[in-house]
Amino acid sequence: MQKRLTLLGSTGSIGDSTLDVVARHPERFSVYALTAHRNGDKLVEQCLRFAPEVAVVGDANTAAHVEAKLRAAGSKTIVLYGPQALVDVSKSDGCDTVVAAIVGAAGLAPSLAAARAGKRILLANKESLVMSGAIFMDAVRDHGAILLPVDSEHNAIFQCMPRDENEHGGISKIILTASGGPFRTREPATLADVTPDEACKHPNWVMGRKISVDSATMMNKGLEVIEAHWIFGLPGDRIDVLIHPQSVIHSLVSYRDGSVLAQLGNPDMRTPIAHALAFPERVDAGVDQLDLAQIAQLSFEKPDYTRFPCLALALKALEEGGIASAALNAANEIAVEAFLERRIGFMAIAATVDAVLNALPNRSPNGLDDVLAADAEARRLAAEIIAKAPAPRVERTV
């Protein structure tokens, strides 16, 4: 039976990879809705190729631009805009599968709507779980939704875990691998001078700018630890992080009998996306087979928390619980945006997040409104801290 997809965040890197897999299997997958924020021209190209019933953008001006181009090309795709439209296409009867690939807190509401509608959810928006893990997982369970992780690490763990939840007691711990990003071996004293372009040059993966910076600070790995806690139900002290520069082993599961299962593959997001799209079957993802003889060597090391303070902050937020993870995520989003706009330096990202966590009293949220209030408060505090921060040094040009 053909799956009907709503793809949230279709113009990003996950969206590109998803549509590449979809295009390879038109008999298996069709597109009900595509969404983008402001990249209207790319969305038009996607709509003309995949003919969704609905396209959603962030604002009225972008919607008018997209609609004009689609009508001129003879497309009948309906164009909507705004947060409610994202929610509507996520819970619509027109789709059975929602690929949640919007970056950041903006992806929470539509992902939660998909869970409450009992959809099959391919989750790439880790912020949904970082901000409101208990609320989100309760919605998945209460409404019979199916959650399939798309992040390469969590998809790897999913593949290495037993399908029968009654057998999960045999798991000792899970191990998330991390490349270490572009600054794994860089002299720590020089990190203050890192530029946005340098931070966005990931050694192994092709990703968007925000997640590339998160990888460079290793905040991304910290968020993934929190995500793994909620998806797989393990406490933080049974989730390890291991630096693996080659990005060939995507994660591991250690069992009580001494066995360790690992999932390997070339670093290409089409592999976990294809796995989640077709699960429990397997389909061609367009990815080359892994040649271990050519790679020859795999290396590992423990993370350096001094070099990567954002990772330590994320682990601390998970341990503290309450609204700490939501505040961590919100402050990080504001700080990364400021760094990409060259308003703060690279090391100020961690300093900003730390300052927000120290300034914001932790508390247990009573519901989604409390989580969103904490998110807004953390963003306000982060913006205030950044406004008072000294300007970063200007790069010399020759």
Swiss-Prot record:
NCBIfam families: Dxr (TIGR00243), PRK05447.1-1 (NF003938), PRK12464.1 (NF009114)
Superkingdom of the organism of origin: Bacteria
Described purpose of this protein according to its UniProt entry: Catalyzes the NADPH-dependent rearrangement and reduction of 1-deoxy-D-xylulose-5-phosphate (DXP) to 2-C-methyl-D-erythritol 4-phosphate (MEP).
Necessary cofactors: Mg(2+); Mn(2+)
One Pfam family per UniProt: DXP_redisom_C
Chain residues that bind NADPH: T11, G12, S13, I14, R38, N39, N125, E127, G208
Enzyme class, spelled out: oxidoreductase
Molecular function GO labels: 1-deoxy-D-xylulose-5-phosphate reductoisomerase activity; manganese ion binding; NADPH binding
The keyword Membrane belongs to this UniProt entry's keyword annotation: no
Protein's organism: Burkholderia ambifaria (strain MC40-6)
Annotated catalysed reactions: 2-C-methyl-D-erythritol 4-phosphate + NADP(+) = 1-deoxy-D-xylulose 5-phosphate + NADPH + H(+)
Gene Ontology annotations of biological process type: isopentenyl diphosphate biosynthetic process, methylerythritol 4-phosphate pathway involved in terpenoid biosynthetic process
Chain residues that bind Mn(2+): D151, E153, E224
Pathway it works in: Isoprenoid biosynthesis; isopentenyl diphosphate biosynthesis via DXP pathway; isopentenyl diphosphate from 1-deoxy-D-xylulose 5-phosphate: step 1/6
Entry-linked InterPro entries: DXP_reductoisomerase (IPR003821), DXP_reductoisomerase_C (IPR013644), DXP_reductoisomerase_N (IPR013512), DXPR_C (IPR026877), DXPR_C_sf (IPR036169), NAD(P)-bd_dom_sf (IPR036291)
Entry keyword set: Isoprene biosynthesis, Manganese, Metal-binding, NADP, Oxidoreductase
PANTHER family in the record: 1-DEOXY-D-XYLULOSE 5-PHOSPHATE REDUCTOISOMERASE, 1-DEOXY-D-XYLULOSE 5-PHOSPHATE REDUCTOISOMERASE, CHLOROPLASTIC
UniProt keyword Manganese present: yes
The protein's name in its UniProt record: 1-deoxy-D-xylulose 5-phosphate reductoisomerase
Upper classification of the organism: Bacteria, Pseudomonadati, Pseudomonadota, Betaproteobacteria, Burkholderiales
This protein's encoding gene: dxr
Its EC number(s): 1.1.1.267
Family per similarity comment: Belongs to the DXR family.
Positions of 1-deoxy-D-xylulose 5-phosphate binding: K126, S152, E153, S179, H202, S215, N220, K221, E224
